[in-house]
Amino acid sequence: VKRISFLALALLAVAQVSSAATCTSGTLASYLALGSGGCTIGNDVLSNFQTLSGQTGATEIATNAVFVTPGGGTSTPSLTFSTSQTVSTGYLVESIFTYQLSGSSITSASLALSNSSEQVDGAVTDIENFCAGGIFGPDGVDGCTGTAGSLLTLDGTQNSDASPLGPASFASITNDFTVDGGTAGSAAGGIFANSFTAMPEPASLFMAAIGILIATTARIYSKRKA
């Protein structure tokens, strides 16, 4: 009876950990719709996706025109965002949004920009601001209640950036992606990827051990019945 009670409690705990849906490919619009429940990559939860007010004069990129592809696992969660935008002289388009990452102890963040081009003084950029162990103020950039940091990419000049983060089991992330035609040029883009390095929390390791114990006990019990 004790064994059955233990297994029941363990199964309940596993069910609670896995209650959020697994992150799948979609659009920024579909990720916004996830709300506070979010989705999971391994044991990490990504949630509370929200768009923010952009630069004066910029045209917002439609959220259903930004595609999201999750990757990695518990120790290497990542999100790749892609869109196809082309602008000419005097035009600027922007996608600025924030989200939260929690679960494992996050130790570093990296940003990569690709599939972009520019002519004359056009530019494609992505700035990633992060708040380790806290949240941003209403603008998604300032007022970090934890430890703030930022990553910068400018196509053709610096296409990747990385920084230590935390360690923290919770972080707020804001991306500000722009395609700017400049005053005499043009630009097109692009793909930008947020990647993180994380260490499983003791609770995650405990749940993994519980899962192994359940499977082992079930096999032993089946053999004894046979």
Task: State where each predicted segment sits.
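Positively charged n-region of N-terminal signal peptides that target proteins for export
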Residues: V1-I4, K223-K225
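A detector of low-complexity, intrinsically disordered, Ser/Thr/Gly/Pro/Ala-rich segments
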Residues: K2, A20-T22, A215
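Helix-boundary and membrane-interface capping/anchor signal
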Residues: A21-A198
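N-terminal signal peptide c-region/cleavage motif recognized by signal peptidases
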Residues: A15-V17
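A short, hydrophobic C-terminal helix/tail in secreted or cell-surface proteins
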Residues: E201-R219
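Sec-dependent N-terminal signal peptides
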Residues: I4-A13, A208-G211
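Single, functionally critical "micro-switch" positions that shape active/binding sites
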Residues: P200, A226
